[in-house]
Amino acid sequence: MVTVVDRVTDRRLRHPEKAHRPDTSVQKKPDWIRVKAPTSQVYKETHGIVRAHKLVTVCEEAGCPNIGECWSQRHASFMILGEICTRACAFCNVATGIPFAVDENEPERVADAVARMELKHVVITSVDRDDLADGGAEHFAKVIYAIRRKAPKTTIEVLTPDFRHKDGALEIVVAAKPDVFNHNLETVPSKYLKVRPGARYFHSIRLLQRVKELDPTIFTKSGIMVGLGEERNEILQLMDDLRSADVDFMTIGQYLQPTRKHHPVIRFVPPEEFESFAKIGKVKGFLHMASNPLTRSSHHAGDDFAILQKARDEKFALQR
């Protein structure tokens, strides 16, 4: 388990808003959560490319359990707009506080790394930047355009913040035409006040719906964590809400507590329940469902994109 103190310097707290909270209990992880430590040469090469281009990855910042597997396959999810978030969600390990100025050279560095790694599919995400007039939307667009120039065969997936109170921001990102637009709901609405207090559930639903209205050709995607105390019927209702917004793809994974200052794991959901959600999601009309304890938004994103394309082609063929 990581510490609440920033890895870069002992003088800056990673989560200052959580520093004085009492420690919460930490449950022992069940066997189905175990992952192997990263040791491969390709993992080291991926790490070297990320460092050489002075880039930030959500794989590291969020403490993703799949980093060893993904980096060993040259898969990486780049986090733009800095590494300090303006919000303080109870589940997230990304550092919080006052961000630095936007790095205008970042789009070219990201594109260079994508080209060098010869990525077939790349995921671009960011911290929340409530301090920026457009929430960072223009920067997202610049990154997309830079990748299109330097790695034209690479498909692009964006995982965006909610752009709350940022009129016109969503339109800027959609106009840049990512192949997949992902925005995570994270949890059921009854848990928002404690888990995701800076966001609004139905604003996020509307954001996803608006993407389809602006450009129906873009795949839409959203994900949640389970194990935060939600009820099964709440998850099923959330699925219906996403389908009402015409969302194509849903991910469901187990919440893992980053530190003792974060929201505790209320329950480790067994694999068979994840399998059940996957089956129900397909019945409800999602083109694809990724649902297992170690599922994360960017995990197997390239493979999932291929599945989405095939599923949509088959759907259109049946409608002819």
Swiss-Prot record:
Stretches assigned to the Radical SAM core domain: 71-287
Binding of [4Fe-4S] cluster 2, residues: C85, C89, C92
Cofactor note: Binds 2 [4Fe-4S] clusters per subunit. One cluster is coordinated with 3 cysteines and an exchangeable S-adenosyl-L-methionine.
GO CC term (a single one): cytoplasm
Compartments where found: Cytoplasm
Pathway: Protein modification; protein lipoylation via endogenous pathway; protein N(6)-(lipoyl)lysine from octanoyl-[acyl-carrier-protein]: step 2/2
Cofactor(s) the record lists: [4Fe-4S] cluster
GO molecular function terms listed in the Swiss-Prot or TrEMBL record: 4 iron, 4 sulfur cluster binding; lipoate synthase activity; metal ion binding
This protein's UniProt keywords: 4Fe-4S, Cytoplasm, Iron, Iron-sulfur, Metal-binding, S-adenosyl-L-methionine, Transferase
Region Disordered: start-end pairs: 1-28
Enzyme Commission number, as recorded: 2.8.1.8
Database matches in CDD domains: Radical_SAM
Family: Belongs to the radical SAM superfamily. Lipoyl synthase family.
NCBIfam families recorded: lipA, PRK05481.1, PRK12928.1
Name recorded for this polypeptide: Lipoyl synthase
Organism: Bartonella henselae (strain ATCC 49882 / DSM 28221 / CCUG 30454 / Houston 1) (Rochalimaea henselae)
Gene label: lipA
